[in-house]
Every structure is written in C-alpha cells, then in structure tokens.
Amino acid sequence: MLKKIIILFLGMFLLSACTDNFRSYFQRSANNRLVDSKGAKGGKRKPVYNNKYITLAKKNIVEDNLDDDNDDDYDSDSPLRGERIDPVKRNREMYLKMIKRDIARQKAEAGFAESDDDMTLSRANKKVRKDDSDKEKKIQEELNQIKAMLRETKRDISKYTCPNAVVNQNYAPPVTNYEPVNYPPVKNSKPYNNNSKVKQKFILEDDDNGSNACSI
C-alpha cells in the first residue's frame, strides 16, 4: 500500500510540472529532434535557418537579383527616419560576409589560397610542359606530311621505270642551236679493218648494253 502511495505521489508531481505547457513538452526542438542533446549553449538555442533559403539568398546576391525596397508602410515624417537601420542592407551585408567565408573555405580546401594572377613554380612547369607537348605534336604532324610526300614521289618515279629495259625507237635527241663544226679528216696511213675481232667484240657489247637500256 505504501508503495502505491509513493508511486502515485511521484506521478502527480511529474505531471504537475508539465501542466503549464503540456503540449510543448513533446514538441520537437529547434534542431527538429524530439531528444536534443546538442544545440543548447548557455541555456539558449541558436536559431535554425533553412539552408535552402540561405543558398537562394546567396545566389540572388551574387547574381544581383534583388527586389526593390518597399517603404510604403514607413512614415516619412518620423523624426527617426535618418536613424533607421535598413534591414535589406543589413541582410545583404550579412550574406556577403557568408559568401566571402565560403569562398575562402573552398580555396583553403582546394589548396589555392594564393591569387590566380600569381605564377607559381608548379604552374610554370605545367605551362612549359604543355607548350613542349604542343610543339612536339606539330613537328610530328609535319614529319608525317613529308613522309607522305616522299612516298607519293616514289610512286610517281616508279611509273617511269621499265622493268625489261626496252629501247624506245621513237626517241629523238633534243635539238640544239649549236652550228656543226666540220673538223678536217684524220690522216691515217693504214685503213680500218672492219672485220677485226676486237671491233666485232665491241659491237656485240654495245648491242647487249642497248638491249638493257630503259626507254624514255
């Protein structure tokens, strides 16, 4: 019996602590969690913004896609007009700072914190290697063109060569403008022997060489 009384008393005590705002007891926290062990600092929770709208606001600021400020509901005769803090300007500056922080973080993560205009040793080496590769590629293309021209020239030359070396009977020597010179006959005490063996040998050799000559 005593145990039941103690349990009932503790239950009433726990329920009495939630009677002021019973619905908010099981409400989700600012971080959209039923049981939130993080997010609280100094007894207060930081406001949770929707990341989708923050990204959209940054994009609009970067693209300069801003709506005009509407001051229709603002009293122009108010003495505090000059001391009013423009919320649009304040939000714009806030998002600009956020964008700058994002850019600095991305550069730090990518390892390019230095300015793009500064020429580093690694970038210079990459540029030199790229230029060298382009020059080698161009030289290789020129060499291929020269080889193709040489092959074509070789084929053209082979068309004018005769494999069996036949003498062309229609060949005529080129005409020159030189006047013929009449030399005096050579005096020889002994007449030529047309039937000599040496002369016949030279005639046969000339005939063999003439049969192997190429026609023009």
Swiss-Prot record:
It comes from the Bacteria. Residues 133-162 form a coiled coil. Residues 1-17 form the signal peptide. A lipid is attached at residue 18 (N-palmitoyl cysteine). It is found in: Cell membrane. It is a lipid-anchor. A lipid is attached at residue 18 (S-diacylglycerol cysteine). GO terms for cellular component: plasma membrane. Keywords: Cell membrane, Coiled coil, Lipoprotein, Membrane, Palmitate, Signal. This is Uncharacterized lipoprotein RC0563.
